[in-house]
Each structure stands twice: as C-alpha cells, then as structure tokens.
Amino acid sequence: MLVVAVSPEADWVSRFADEVIAEAERRAPGKPIVCASGLSPSGPIHLGNLREVMTPHLVADEIRRRGHECVHLISWDDYDRFRKVPAGVPGIDETWAQHIGKPLTSVPAPAGSRYANWAEHFKAPMIESLAQLGVEYHPISQTEQYTTGKYREQILLAMRERARIDAVLDRYRTKNRTAGGAQPGKLDEEEAAAAAEAAEGSGAAGEDDGNTVAGYFPYKPYCSVCDRDLTTVVAYDDETTELDYTCACGHAEQVRLSEHNRGKLVWKVDWPMRWAYEGVIFEPSGVDHSSPGSSFQVGGQLVGEIFGGEQPIGPMYAFVGISGMAKMSSSRGGVPTAADALDIMEPPLLRWLYARRRPNQSFKIAFDQEIQRLYDEWDTLGRKVGDGTATPADAAAYTRAVGTAAGLLPVTPHVLPYRTLASIVDVTTGDEAQTLRILRDLDPADPVASLDETRPRLDKAQRWITTHVPADQRTRVLAGPDTARLAELGETERESLRLLLAGLDEHWSLEGLTTLVYGVPKVMLGLPPDVKPTPELKTAQREFFALLYHLLVGRDTGPRLPTLLLAVGPDRVRTLLTPAAA
C-alpha cells in the first residue's frame, strides 16, 4: 500500500479528517469510521453530484492513509419516486410520464438500454467513473434496504413517534412562515436557479413531509396496484400496525406495516434514520439541503430525539459549474457527467479540481478552450511538486489527485502539453502515422517512440477536439499556396518568410521553432536575439504571426505556431510559404 505523507495542517481534507477521527473516537471507539454520500439516479448524475462523493471520499482516504479503518458508504437513492420526465435523454418520450410516482427501480430504462430499469441505467456510468477515479466505497441500494425489511424497526418506531416528529417539523414550518422563506446569504440569479434545480435531483425534491387530512404519517406507501406513491395514509393502528391508504388511481387497501415492504419514510425522516442506522460520522450536503427548515437541519433534531443517533459532521458544499455554461441540474438531460469529463481529461486532473477547493467554494470544470489552461496549470504544479517548490496546500491537493491510500492512479508515461497534443490531432485529424511523426520531432533529445507513450492523454485531447471544438474553430491547413496573397507580399514580408524557411532545418523541434518564429521579427528590426520585448517588437511579431496563419490556415489566428509548423511538416510549409519567382 502506498501511503503518501501529507502535512496534517496542509489542507481542508486534513482538517476534516482530524475532526472526524476525534468525533469517531468519542462516539464509537474502536469501530470503523463511517463517511457517507447519497446519489439519486433520477437522470444523468452530473458533476455537481460528484462533489457529494468526492468530498467524503477525500476525507475517508486521508483517514485510511493514517492507518484507521474507514468505510465510505454510497447510498443509491433508487427507491425515490420518479418525479418528472427529464428533457434531452435519448430513448424516452412523453409516454414515460405514466411512470411518474413509481420507484426509480420500477421505471423502464430508456429504449435501447441494456439495463433492467431506469435507476440501473443511470447508475452504471457513474459506477464506471468512480472506478476510474479510484473511489473506494461500499454501495447500498435503498430499494433493497426497504423491500427486504432492513428498516422495518425504524419505520415502526417513526410511526409510533409520529406526533413528536410532526412537532419538530412544525417548529421549522413556523420558522419558515415567520421568515417568509428567506434563504441564508445572497444568491445571484444563476445560483438561485441552480439551488432550485439541484433539489430536483435530491431526495427532498417536491415531496410533502407526511401531513395528511387524517393527521401526520411519516411513511408513504407505494400503491400495490399502480406502483405509484400517489397515496394518502388515512389511518394507522399502533398496536396491530395496520395501515389504511387510498391512492389517486382509485385503489384503497389495508396493510400490516410489520410485514409491508412497499413504501418508504418521507425524506426528512428517512435521512436522519439512516444516519443512526449506519452510524455516519461524516456526510456533506448541498446548499439545497442546508437552508432553514431543510432536511439537514430538521434531520439534526430528529436523529437524536427519535432515532437515538447523532448528526454527522456535515459541511455544506457549493455548486460546480461548467466553463461557459450555467450551473447544472440532474433533472435536466444533457448536463455533463463524470463520464463526459473523463472522456476529455485524465482522472487525476478531475480529482484535483475537487481536491484543491474547500467544499464551500464554487468552481468550474472546463469543456471549452479553458481545459488547455487547466492542463497547463496541472503540469506546472507537477513540476513544482517534483522540485519541492509547491506550497503545502498545493502539494497536498496534488498528492490526493494522483493517488489514494491504495496506490497511484494510472498516468501517461510520456507527458506532453495537452494543448500541443490537441493542436497536433486537430491538424492531422487523428491520422496516427502523421501524429507519431510530429511527436517524434517535438523534442529530438527525448523523442516519442510510440503513441502508446502519450496515452491516455493523447486520446483525451483527440476526443476533446472532435467533440467539443466547433467546426468553425477547427484547424484546416490550406490544400495549396494562396497565390493571390503571396503575389501581394511586400519586400519586408518576403524577406521574413525567406528567413523563416532558411532556418527550418536547423530549428526543427518545438523549442527550436519557437526561437525561430519569435526571432525572425527581431532580425528584421536589427535587434539582438536576447532583446527584451518592446511595443515595436511585439507589433512586428503579431503581424508576422498573422501572415503565417493566413498563408497556412487561411485565418489570422490558430494553434501555437511552432506546433502548427511541426504538424504541417517542412516540405508542405515550404510549399505554402514560398512566393512565386518574380
């Protein structure tokens, strides 16, 4: 087992680990420490939901690094009701509306899916992503827990104590009415919308808290005829546990709750029940669960008063956005998921984005050009960690990103800048022979022997280029010289091209071509190679670069010129940049 030393004061993960270890020793000395997450497979499980997993994962992993036994539970809330038909999900249509109100495990999967039901269809890609990310966890299906009677005693207890539960809930109902439903802090328009949307993907979304005309009942049966939760409890006998309910479909039934396994506790009672049942010490919650009267706040009262447990240490986590897009909602189809992110970036980079920010800090994950800057920052951090110049917090985040207590995650053997790889596969359109030729020329002192050395980063860059870069932003090298533009060149432009072409062979590497393209304008201005940039020199370089881009790709901008020149190749560069003889 690889255990990487991290300063105990280095970062937010270490501080939470300290707190959790101390709290576990107070509550349950000698027992495994329990951290928990909850995910509802009501639709695509987006990158905001991933924070629900990564926050306790990182804390649990730090606890394991210190030699403590720690289990990370992930509860699949697959017994939640199907609330609405999400937009943008392939393989479904308006007919899925007939399943609204059923447990997610009773809803058919989208057409063409190989999975048995809706919940399994949306769990599967998340399970695969968690494996790639190195997340070690113990899964719990809430469908299995409820339908096999695991929570029977807790359900009967909640029904016996329904008056006390109702009194606790009523305190918060009163507070909310008095406060006018105010939310803590100030949210901008985007954050407010995101808060409402996030609730749709949680167990708290759109459900009543158990109030009925006949009284308060914290248990909601699923109808035995239509399988939906459009039911109302109308009577309950504590002695016999006989429960009477009616359903909107017209069915009415009496069941014995000591035997009945087709229903669940309402969310604000279900969550604290699970805290006590599992002995959870640490579980974060989103903003939608942390406002006055929310499930986390109410649960903190119920877990002790009703179920004899204690509320977990529970930091609120902020939203995760997408670069260039509004924040996400799992109730809406088409939102980026962990699988989408891992399609274009390596697992350590995605882990790093969650590890480097405190849970209450928002951040964005880039699917646009910003991903190139993120990769530059990541590679720079790796070099700083290697030479010992990284700050303790940055070094800790890097360590948590590249591995876990169980070992290091797979890495690309021959690391090259993501933006360089993206530019190369953009120009070569993925042709492996051309790509390898260019990669071999990048650095003659450390040549790439095979494409496998640059994988998986090369493959991630290629998928980003082909799936996230608009067609009008792709690089298309001209098929032949722009004879009209070449004929219009002035003597200064012709001389600058002559100097560039004359230096190609001597400078044919990424570093050499960088020196060459920046050096030609210096020569034209009569300046020494090591001169500091001046406004005049910068202007001359911009004009020279624009000329090269126009003659190579027909635009004024493009990928970095040294990379572009390598990708085009010396022979074709000469063809495109050589004016016809006068």
Task: Report each predicted region and the residues it spans.
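Basic, alpha-helical terminal appendages of large translation-related enzymes
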Residues: M1-P32, P44-I45, V71-L73, T174, ...
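N-terminal catalytic cores of NTP/NDP-binding nucleotidyl/phosphoryl-transfer enzymes
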Residues: L2-P90, P272-S291
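Residue-level signal for inorganic ion chemistry
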Residues: H46, A158, E346, L548
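A structural motif corresponding to the C-terminal end of an alpha-helix
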Residues: R66-H68, P125-H138
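Charged, often glycine-rich, active-site loop that binds/positions anionic groups
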Residues: Y79-A97, Q154-I155, A326-G333
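A glycine-rich helix N-cap at a beta->alpha junction
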Residues: D93-A116, S129, L133
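Active-site cores that bind ATP or allylic diphosphates and position pyrophosphate for catalysis
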Residues: A109, V135-A338
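Catalytic adenosine-cofactor/nucleotide-binding cores of aminoacyl-tRNA synthetases and other
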Residues: S291, F296, V303, A318-P470, ...
